[in-house]
Amino acid sequence: MEVGRYLKEGLLISLQQRLREFAEGIRKPTSSLKVHRQIVSLLEKPDPVILDIGCNDGSDARRFLQLRPKAQLFCFEPDPRAAARCRENMGPLDRMRLFEVAISDRNGRIDFHPSNGDGDAKEWDLSGSIRQPKNHLSEYQWVRFDGPISVETRRLDDWCSEAGLESIDLIWMDVQGAESDVIAGGKETLTKTRFIYTEYSDQELYEGQLPLRAILDLLPSFELVAQFPRGVEGDVLLRNTKL
């Protein structure tokens, strides 16, 4: 019993030290790959299970595979253009699987609002969302949105149950204002998820988008590990304190 307790305490101290080092490291300017490297160091295993929700062309997933070749990557992307590029970029990677669905709070079909851009950014597909654009239209006037398209959508809990995933090391999420939808459809899954990395905005870029404080309120078992602010927007890394 004593040995087990000391071992558990030692692992906890090790994780806390890594979290402090992570927080200290991000105070300095850092590259995207360095952020990925710091995150996988917190996972402390060679074969983590990672869900990339809103993966676009799969760039982040490929970075994780570069750092952890034995990782299992499950990628979700509802925009047909981005999904096609992701599938092409995947090539023969057998550790990375793509699902062309939107993750939300329901199963079935849902409207997706694809984005485009003006000028050199006419192929811009990084701002599409299942939520209608709102302040995004004035804040980023060079981005435009075409009429909605119907895409397949799944609840995270139902998808994970069918996939047979018993635990998840990291959810990497970029869903353009639909964070609360993912959370609502994934409450059971999140209880067995160790880390969440998500984009946020404290202005309502999309209809009904929640600010960071409200997102954190929906995740009471998660603590804020690190924040990467860009004005009133940014990204955060959260840790499940129950695991």
From Swiss-Prot:
Disruption phenotype: Disruption of the gene has no effect on nodulation. It is found in: Cytoplasm. GO terms for molecular function: O-methyltransferase activity. The keyword Transferase applies. GO terms for cellular component: cytoplasm. It holds the Pfam family Methyltransf_21. The keyword Cytoplasm applies. Its EC number is 2.1.1.-. GO terms for biological process: methylation. Its main location: cytoplasm. Keywords: Cytoplasm, Methyltransferase, Nodulation, Plasmid, Transferase. PANTHER family: NODULATION PROTEIN, SLL1456 PROTEIN-RELATED. This is 2-O-methyltransferase NoeI. It comes from Sinorhizobium fredii (strain NBRC 101917 / NGR234). The lineage of its organism: Bacteria, Pseudomonadati, Pseudomonadota, Alphaproteobacteria, Hyphomicrobiales.
